[in-house]
Amino acid sequence: MSVKNRSVRLLILTASATAMLLPGASLAQAEAIKKAPAGNAFYKASAKQIKAGKPGTIIWARQVKYTANGRVALASASKTMLVLYRSLDPKGKPIAVSGMVDLPKGKAPKGGFKSISWAHGTTGAADICAPSRDVAGGPADSYITYATASYNRWLKAGYAVFRTDYPGLGVKEPPHPYLIGVSEGRSVVDITLAARELYPKLSKDYLIGGHSQGGQGGLFAGSLAPKLAPKLNMKGVFSYAPASHLYEQGNAVSNLGDDFKGLTALVMMILNSAMHEARVQPSTLVTPQIEALLPKIEEVCLAQLTGDDIFGNIAPNAILKPGVTTASIDAVLKAMNPNVKIKAPVLIAQGLDDTTVFPSFTAALVAELKTSGDKVTYDTFPGLTHSGVVTDPAASAVVLDWIKARLR
C-alpha cells in the first residue's frame, strides 16, 4: 500500500471512529464536537471557548463507560456522554455548564427517541457536589444516587435522559445560584438543545422533570422552554415535592431555636444564594460567626455543611444580626417561588410525610398554578417522605404512566 493510500485509509478510519462516538450525527457534526480533556480539566473551558457559541451548544463531550460501582454512566443506557455546554448566568453572562446525556438501548423508533430533561435535588453548592463528579462514597453520593433507579426506569421505557449539573456545580464558576429559578431552569432547557447537537435524530418531543430544588427549577424550566427552545416540543413538567414559598418559610425559620439546628445549613445555602443575587454584603446582614463560615458553602456539600464543625451547631435564630432589615433579600426569596405560567400539562407529586418540603406549601403552590391557568394534576402519597416520593414503586408507577401519556 502506498504512503498516500495509507494516509487516506487512516483519515477514513479516524473519521469513522469520530462518527461512531456520536450515533445519529453526520460526519460534519461529529467533527464539530471538540474532543474533551481528561480528568477534571473537562470542567475548565476558557472564556473564549465559552463565548464561541450560543446557549445550548456544546463546548466538548466525552463518553463515560458503565461500571458496576460507577455513578455517572447508567446501567440501562446504551451510551452516557459527559457534556460541557453553554448557558447564561442570572445576569446574562455566558457560562459553561456540565451534565450528562444518556441514550436508551435498542433501535430508536420512527421520529427518534423522546426524552426527559431532569433537574436534580439539592446536593450542595460546591463544584464537587455535581452529580457528574459523583463517586461511590463521595461527599454528595447519598443525595444523588436515590434517583438512579428512576433514570434507569425511564431508559428502559425507551426515553433518552438528560441530567444537568446546574451552573456552578461541576464547573467552579459562577457560584451556584441555588434556587434562582431562571438560572436553574435555563440550564435544564439548554442541555436539551445540547443533546440534540450530539444526537440530531432525537425526537423534538420531551418532558422536564425534577425533585425538590429540581422540582422548583423544573417548573421554571417549563415556563422558559417555549422561548429558549421554540423548535422543540415541551410536552409537560413533572415535579416531585418542589421547593416553594421560600419567603414565607424564611420568616418562620428565622425565629427557630436550638431544636432546629439541623435546618441551618440549608437555610444558609438559600441565604447565601440570595445575598449573591441581591448583591448584599454578608457583613451587613449575618453575624460574624456565620460570615466566617460562608466560604465553606463553596467548598463542601450539604451533608458536610450540617456537621457540628460548620452549621450543625448553630440555631436558625442566630444567623442574622439583631435588628437588620432584609428587603432586597426578601425580594429574591419571593422570586424563587415557582408560581409560573406553563403552557403544557403539569404533574406535582407530594409525599404527605415530607418534613423538608411541607405538603401545606405544595398545596398552596398548586392553587397558585391553577389560578394562573396551568393544567395541574396534584397527586399526594400518604406515608411517603421527601425522598420516598421519588423512590417508592407505587409513586414511580403513577409518574411513569403520566410520562407515557404525554410522550405517546
Task: Show the residue positions of the predicted features.
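Short, surface-exposed "cap/lid" segments of acyl-processing enzymes
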Residues: 90-98, 102-157
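Acidic catalytic loop of the alpha/beta-hydrolase fold
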Residues: 246, 352-357
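Primarily recognizes the serine-hydrolase "nucleophile elbow" in alpha/beta-hydrolase
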Residues: 193-199, 203-262
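C-terminal catalytic histidine-bearing segment of alpha/beta-hydrolase fold enzymes
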Residues: 330-331, 363-364, 370-408
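Short beta-strand/loop motif that positions the catalytic acidic residue
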Residues: 342, 347-354
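Alpha/beta-hydrolase active-site loop
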Residues: 178-198
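Accessory cap/linker subdomain of secreted extracellular hydrolases
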Residues: 47, 243-339
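Catalytic-loop region of hydrolases
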Residues: 29-108, 370
